[in-house]
């Protein structure tokens, strides 16, 4: 277990049995990221990695994520068997050949499956890393349910707000960065001088939209009473 460039999460590569995944592919053709749930109770990314490495089951996913780490079982340059219809009809043009599958480990409480907050946060890290790596927009991050109607990940089909929350987290940092960049473009803070009652003071001079401003805190430092 270690770290991989750009991914702030413990990472392991555990190659799945060759019978569980398909042909090689050009990663330039990757257009979607499909999120799934394992449908197990208390499983781990390591356990799933070992399972798909040691058993022939004819299915797979590229990544498995749990509370504290992720395991990659199929190389991005290979086709994983993770989002076929199993008799259902396709609802979009996402296929195994043009997507990456990310499985989230689950727990079961009183017969109901849940994806823990920590697992969700780690899945966000993995998905955002893949989005950046392959230039995939948030609109192309979908559930298995969106591919063919399968109830997967079931907790996020049952509760659409959970899915909406996940999607919002994928673009949150990008939006914050954009706002910050916009602010930096329109607002510049430099050190200046002001003379008040014949005395010179150092001030923070703010140039914004072509106008000069002084931070109110500067007046307080000069000994004036300042109210907000």
Locations of regions flagged by a protein language model:
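Basic/polar, cationic surfaces and motifs that engage anionic cell-wall
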Residues: 1-15, 22-27, 97, 105-184
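Residue-level signal for tight coil/turn positions that link beta-strands
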Residues: 67-68, 138, 209
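N-terminal catalytic cores of peptidoglycan-degrading enzymes
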Residues: 1-95
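A sequence-level detector of short linear motifs
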Residues: 72-73, 149, 202, 214
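Sec/Tat-exported extracytoplasmic proteins
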Residues: 37-41, 74, 130-134, 174, ...
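Primary recognition of N-terminal secretory signal peptides and signal-anchoring hydrophobic helices
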Residues: 175-228
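A mature extracytoplasmic/lumenal domain signature
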Residues: 39, 67, 77, 106, ...
């Amino acid at each position: 277990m270690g770290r991989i460039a750009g991914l702030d999460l413990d990472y392991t590569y555990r190659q799945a049995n060759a019978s569980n995944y398909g042909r090689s592919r050009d990663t330039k053709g990757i257009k979607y990221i499909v999120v799934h749930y394992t449908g197990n109770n208390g499983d781990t990314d390591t356990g799933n990695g070992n399972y798909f490495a040691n058993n022939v089951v004819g299915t797979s996913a590229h990544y498995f994520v749990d509370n504290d780490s992720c395991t990659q079982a199929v190389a991005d340059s290979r086709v994983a068997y993770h989002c076929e219809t199993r008799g259902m009809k396709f609802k979009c043009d996402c296929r195994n050949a043009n997507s990456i599958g990310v499985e989230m480990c689950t727990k079961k409480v009183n017969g109901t499956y849940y994806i823990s907050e920590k697992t969700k946060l780690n899945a966000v890290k993995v998905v955002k890393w893949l989005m950046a790596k392959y230039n995939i927009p948030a609109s192309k991050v979908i559930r298995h349910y969106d591919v063919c109607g399968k109830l997967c990940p079931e907790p996020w089909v049952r509760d659409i707000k959970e899915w909406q929350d996940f999607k919002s987290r994928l673009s949150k940092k990008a939006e914050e960065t954009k706002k910050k960049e916009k602010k930096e473009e329109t607002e510049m803070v430099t050190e200046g001088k002001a003379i008040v009652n014949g005395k010179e003071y150092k001030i923070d001079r703010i140039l914004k939209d072509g106008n000069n401003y002084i931070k109110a805190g500067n007046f307080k430092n000069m000994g004036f009473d300042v109210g907000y």
